[in-house]
Amino acid sequence: LTHVLAAILAAIAFVPIDDRPVVLQLPVMLGRIAGVTVEPPPRALLGRFFELGKPDAIIAWLNHEAAKPQTNAFVISSDMLAYGGLTASRAPGPNYADAESRLRELAHLRTRRPHAWIGAFGTIMRLAPTGIPAGTDFFAPYPTWSYLQQYANLHDPPLPSETARAQHLRELIGQPALDAYMATRGRDLAINRLLLKLTANGTIDRLVLGQDDAGPVGLHVRDLQLLQADLGALGLAGRASIEPGADELGTALVANAIARAAHWIPRIAVRYSLPDGASFQDPIEYAPISTAIDALIGLCGGVRDDEHPDITLYVRVPTTTAAADDTLTSAMAADAAGGRSVALADLSYLRSDRDQASFAQRLLASGLAARLDAYSSWNTNANTVGTALAEAIAAGAGRRMNTYNALAHRTFTFIMFLDDYAYHDEVRPDLNATLAAEGITDHTLLAPDVAASMTQRDRALLWGYADAILAQLDPGYHIAAMLIGLPWSRTFETSIDAALAPNL
């Protein structure tokens, strides 16, 4: 009863970075797994793609949540609070003074709830502005965003071998657009430095700044170095971190808050599918994958412990051999059979979608998928690992508080296989090929009639995979209801809202 009461009084007010399923739906579902309420603002306040969020209304909502005695933690996107979301953070718009004023409201929140836990997450601006088609009424439509991306990926300053290319790109971009881009980077850097100061003065308990989509070379390197120097000078080790990633940051901090509600520090072991797996480099992360993985363990509220773990994270890297796959699956099966918590992050999609699909099919057909506490395989190393760790931690916390919701857990895992495997490996290529056959090669923002047609095709195809996947994951359950869509009128992601029910 004490544990159940603790869960009830551990509600989390959660401000996501935008309204996409991976950053809004998944953190809320983590709460359901653990039996902890994760409350986001009304959907209308979060905006949609180029329709920016409403930070001032979200501040009012936060004050309302702060008045609730059961709200014990806050997990807040600084990009949403300062600018109106991730897309807004990459574009001119709110000036520094407006953004700074909004973030100062965090101090008001701290005054009202001095004992609440406040976690904040922000992004270090990626090198490319948001990709959008030519003619779109937003910052840097194609081809400008592509030229900016190429320019920002050069060394800073450009190497002698890059000088001519840099000059040509500057001419293609045009000085007004380049100035606006650089000013946006400067504004975001100044806001991130402010967040570090707010953490140093105790306003924020835990801060993470994620480097969004950028490799080891580019305009971001100088920003990273300055922020890392600030972090060190302010003595924030353990309270603030700078790491690769973006979309998983809110999910990881929600997992941290859930683990705190359970008074649990998860011990995490990491097992790579190849001996040198830790050194693999995701092309849009600035450091080897082990950097983000170790950082995410801490961000989720855990500690690395390869000897006596509560959860073992298995990481399947690209180019894993057939023999290594056999060893990997045997080890996961042995852990699961022993009642140990197993999370799988499959990174093979970084090289081959077909390899990823084949391994997902193997997990499902063997029954091993049903015995995992977490599965993830999407977009980047940090995205994948952060999601897998968070799901396993939510389940572990719920079990420790006696508030674990097995049906919510089944639903989360079902959606991950349906999205990460069926949509991205099977359905999305079909949608893109269909669009290309119709002469539509830019899929970053579809016209309304095209989006409606592709949504219908998405639903029809994905439903065909859904029943088969659920039959392998949970043969005693059926899909009671499911909504499928293309939430941002593009093929980059799908939305899946599923309700499972036991067979009668």
Range-by-range predicted roles:
Residues A11-L504:
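An N-terminal assembly and electron-transfer interface module characteristic of large anaerobic redox
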Residues H3-A11:
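Hydrophobic alpha-helical targeting segments used for export or membrane insertion
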